[in-house]
């Protein structure tokens, strides 16, 4: 195991900056997930750690050693790519041992490591098969095994589940999580799927346009996003946003006016520092935190546009006339409502988020469980 530290790391191609002033501390044995939309620089960041991309400026440390100019083979890292990249003419055992043979490892060492890793990954009964005889999940396990036999200090995974169907992705997520718990290796995992990030990570790094938007534990990012980008990216369906105007402030409270015909006002338990009366801000509320109207004091009303019945839950898209946008309401039950009907939902102030015009969040003061 080894720690990974990035200090003011920047990557640029000419005048195009794809990673800017990245500062990260990844501890020994941590499972860290880089997540963000396409083009945010997450794979580039992983490739700089691996040594497949040069660092324009800043420093990279693996363990206590500066690695900027160290060749990839000498960094003690192993990498799994989105593509399995297996040799079709070689067996599972031969694919897994290929790197060790190139490195000149002794035959008994190779056999011992391959057999140990095959047991961990449940591949022992498949060692003599060729890749064409394997399922997609089995091929991905072989690709992971090929990296594991090299015994890297840091394990890098670049969107390893993207080529799998939904059921296999769930299965492989569970297997990767178990593998990390069993081996205790430092793992850095890249994905655009925030569900993978939330379920796998000890710590999530959210990237936006080449910068670190927020670093934290999954529930910290879910309940206390640092800005509107993180709030909208983490969570599915995404957070609802409403334009509001500040009408008053007090210690640890901000009063805002909702965009409804009755101009209803509500006090939100958020940090009021630097918030000015009259400022235009955004109120955020997650679909699952909206309430049935009969148990709430603050009511929003609109017309039902779409109803999605998922069996265990219902998602209702409601158009609020005064702002001409849809809110998503999610309830863990069957809700029978017709499209076109008028539907009222409740807004709990303690579950609301408030964002300034520049997108930064006013710190929520409501204590959430598990954080």
Swiss-Prot record:
InterPro entries: AAA+_ATPase, ABC_transporter-like_ATP-bd, ABC_transporter-like_CS, ABC_transpr_MalK-like, ABC_transpr_MalK/UgpC-like, Mo/tungstate-bd_C_term_dom, NA-bd_OB-fold, P-loop_NTPase. SUPFAM superfamilies: MOP-like, P-loop containing nucleoside triphosphate hydrolases. It catalyses: D-maltose(out) + ATP + H2O = D-maltose(in) + ADP + phosphate + H(+). GO terms for cellular component: ATP-binding cassette (ABC) transporter complex, substrate-binding subunit-containing; maltose transport complex. It comes from the Bacteria. It holds the Pfam family ABC_tran. Keywords: ATP-binding, Cell inner membrane, Cell membrane, Membrane, Nucleotide-binding, Sugar transport, Translocase, Transport. It is an enzyme of class 7 (translocase). PROSITE patterns: ABC_TRANSPORTER_1 (PS00211), ABC_TRANSPORTER_2 (PS50893), MALK (PS51245). Its EC number is 7.5.2.1. ATP binds at residues 36-43. Its main location: membrane. It is found in: Cell inner membrane. The keyword Nucleotide-binding applies. It is a peripheral membrane protein. One of its GO terms (molecular function) is ATP binding. Residues 4-234 form the ABC transporter domain. NCBIfam families: PRK11000.1, PRK11650.1. Belongs to the ABC transporter superfamily. Maltooligosaccharide importer (TC 3.A.1.1.1) family. The complex is composed of two ATP-binding proteins (MalK), two transmembrane proteins (MalG and MalK) and a solute-binding protein (MalE). Part of the ABC transporter complex MalEFGK involved in maltose/maltodextrin import. Responsible for energy coupling to the transport system. This is Maltose/maltodextrin import ATP-binding protein MalK. It comes from Shigella flexneri. The gene is malK.
